[in-house]
Amino acid sequence: MRRFTTLLALLALSLVAVGGAVSAQRAAPVTSLTFCVDPTFPPMELTRSSGAIFGFDVDMAKAIAADWKISSKPVKTAFPGLIPALKSKKCEVVISGIFVTPDRLKQAGAVTYMHSHRVLLVRGGNPKKIAGPNDLKGKNVVVQAGTKYEEYLKGLKAKIGFSLQSYPGDTDAVAQVLIGRADVVLTQDTSAAYQIGQHPGKLQIAYLFPQQDSFGIYFRKSDTQLAAALREEVSTLKKNGTLAKLAAKYKLPVADVK
């Protein structure tokens, strides 16, 4: 009788173990974490000479995939096409230094993972003496196309008047300031910090906008299981210090990922 009871106990434990294994397998809401990304916004995402995409967002995607025991893969996509690509299922999520905004939330869901501020970036010494948005009047201003920065500048241009040119990537826009073709670029403090580090003495922040922006991971609204898993995972990566380590690695304010 005791032997029979012991066998039943072992059988029960084996079933629990199997059930646990199945649960672990089901913990990953997707089989592979494909993410649409525009690698023109360092240090969030950029491209090596080999063509490999890397940066804060790429490392974060890898960390998420590692916890889920699946692979991650970037899907290179032009910035204006990120949300459309998500909706057409070219990727499972968008992780690309993209703001969480009311307009985008009408099309997809999002999980916030970082906060930051917009800045006006100028040449070292600030030769045009730009101290705020109103000082853009009559200046040559550049920005990355398809961004909320561009949308904001178009509205401001209509009010005060200045030359505005848009470029495919943030790095392209910053380059115009470096070579003297533009007076100022509107970008994010994350990008500005990276560019200033890459070009010591040649660039500086002229103005930091007071309002806070939030970067988010976008997902299809119909993917409720993925949404729940992402919320839990981002919370975990914040609590265990993974995002803080990535912020330090890419010389970003650690407080932005708390």
Identify the role of each PLM range.
Residues 81, 97-106, 154-155, 176-211:
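A ligand-binding cleft/hinge motif common to bilobed small-molecule-binding domains
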Residues 45-47, 61-70, 149-167, 196-200, ...:
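Ligand-binding cleft/hinge of the Venus flytrap
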Residues 58-67, 124-127, 134, 139-140, ...:
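Extended ligand-binding regions for polar small-molecule ligands
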Residues 22-52, 128-129, 134-140:
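Immediate post-signal peptide segment of exported/extracytoplasmic ligand-binding proteins
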Residues 39, 115-122, 189, 193-235, ...:
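Periplasmic-binding protein-like
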Residues 62, 66, 71-135, 203-204, ...:
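Acidic, polar ligand-binding/catalytic clefts
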Residues 58, 73-84, 128, 164-179, ...:
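Short helix-initiation/N-cap motifs at beta->coil->alpha
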Residues 36-41, 75-80, 89-101, 116, ...:
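Beta->alpha turn/N-cap motifs
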